[in-house]
Each structure stands twice: as structure tokens, then as C-alpha cells.
Amino acid sequence: MKPYCMISNAKTFAFSAENPTGARAGGSKGGDCTKLSPTVAIRAGETVTLVDTDGPGMIQSIWFTGYVGHSFVIRMYWDNCEYPSVEAPISAFFGTAYDENFVDRDGKYAVLNSAQILVAPGRGLNCYWEMPFKKHCRITMENRGEKDQSLYYIITGCHCEVPDEIGYFHASYRQEHPVQKGRSYTIIDGIQGKGQFVGVTLATGMNGNNTCWVEGEARMYIDDDKYPSIHYTGTEDYFCGSYGFGNDVQIKSYQTYSGLYSGMYAIYGDNRAFYNGQQRFLLYRFHVADPIHFETGFRMTLDNMGWTGPRYDDYTSCAYWYQTLPSAPLKPLLFKVFFTK
């Protein structure tokens, strides 16, 4: 029986610019049939609180639009922890890290059509990861840019009983521009606690020669592993593709795809259908059907390698997992101009 057909005592809430407290009957007062306050203005250097509510409960869906570029940083705090369990540029959190500064941007984002994250045309960002909490939930947005910006949002959830054994949602951003040649890129490390790894979104930017770039192997280290317990033979294989993401091995052309839990859904750059230099790719893999369980910790790396050996491409990622609290502090954000091509 699916949860949505079961009657319960849960109480729905929704935080938005029209109802910033999330209170019952708290939205659009005095503004029937009009828009009173559809956006929240976030000044340069300012952090605003989008959600602040006591538990127990669960965040069930998140929607953003407006300015949703990489200068906005989203953070989530569970059960009054002093440091965030989620910290990432908003565009990278939603798997669309190449959001600006490339020549073929036309104001729209490529469509990401998965079960956990949906990126709709026109920059509609949607998240469906369930995020339970026992005592408290706080979600903030920081504007690290030089200009004031506006954000549309609605964050929906419910106050309800949650089991003692819940895992708390976490997400961490990483980037290396470029990856050090001959060394693996780290998707995530430093996790301490019991939980399960549930996926990653990845943006890659090609540097140098125009040969295949997907020979790098994905490795997962569970608890105190010296060598990986899970080992994928290539980058495209980890993202559930094969043979260089190709649809024609003879002419070496790419084929995008977007499924419930995995995809290589967008390519940016000249001659984007063919193996070429200076292209950029957006990928995702969500371990909803096959979560990777760990008792004390978890680490994942991805080689940057092509047919001709190690490469030095630009990698950007956001990893997602659930775990017990308290968790280790996330690695600090490297904040610079994230994407310059």
C-alpha cells in the first residue's frame, strides 16, 4: 500500500514567499486573486531563512525558480545542529551545475527527468528526496554573488511521527578545475556514522584532446576499506550507460538519456553530438533501488581517464546520502568563479 492512499494524522505545511512562516491559513492575506509577494529578495552577501519549523516531521518536496545560479548556496540543518548537513550551490544540488558562462545558454536549462530531481524548462528546479527530522528543521539560502537577486520557492512537508531509526539527508559539493592529472577525483569522503549513500550528480568539462574521456573507474570504499568493495569498470558504466555513451561506435557520436535513477542528460559545446574537445556533460546516478549501506563511514572516487591515459578535465559534483546524527562537518565550499568556459 502506497503512503499517499493511507489516512494518517500528518499535518501538511508549505513555506513560500507568500507564506514565509508556513502557518496554516498563513498565505496571501488580503490578496485574493492577486500576487502579493511571489518572490523573496536576497541581497548580495545576505543569508535568508526559508524554512524554520519544529519536529517531528519531514520535507517532501522543494521547488525553486527565479535566480537559481551557482552564487546561491543552499544549506539544511537538522535537529538544531550548529553546522549544516546539506551545503551546495543550488544549481549543483539540482544536478545542473553548468548554469552560466557558456556560449550556448539561451535562458533555459536542459531537462533532467528523474524520480528524485526534476529540472524543467525555464529553470524550474524540483527535489523529491524525503528529508525526515525529529526535533527541528532549518533551511537557508545565501547569496554569495555581487548582485541582489530574487528567488521563487515553495517547500512542502508534513509534521508527523518519524521512526527512531531514520537517517538524516545529507549533500556535499565538490569541484576540481582541473582534476590533478594521474589522481582520482573524490566524489565524497569524510563521512562518519551509519547510513547509506544514495547518489551523485556530476558535471564534467573537457580539456585537451578530443578523445574518449569515460574510461575512469568509479570506486566505493565502505567503512575501513583499504581497497574498494564496489568497483565500476568505467565512468559511463557507473552512470548506467556503455561504450562511451555512444549510439554509433563507428562514427563516435554521443546519445543523451534520462531515466528514473540515472542519465547523461545534457551536452554543451560545439558539435555536441560527436567526440570533441571542450564539451561539457551533465550526469546523475541515484541509488534508490540499490542504496550503498555503511556502518562507520563511506568514500567514493572517480578516475579521470580516457583511451590515451589520465586526463585533466574539470569535475564538479554533489553527493547525497542518509546517516545518523551527529555527522562530521562537511568539507568547506571552494568558492570562486565556478565555471568560466
How would you describe each model-predicted region?
Residues 1-341:
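Beta-strand-centric surfaces of beta-sandwich/beta-rich domains
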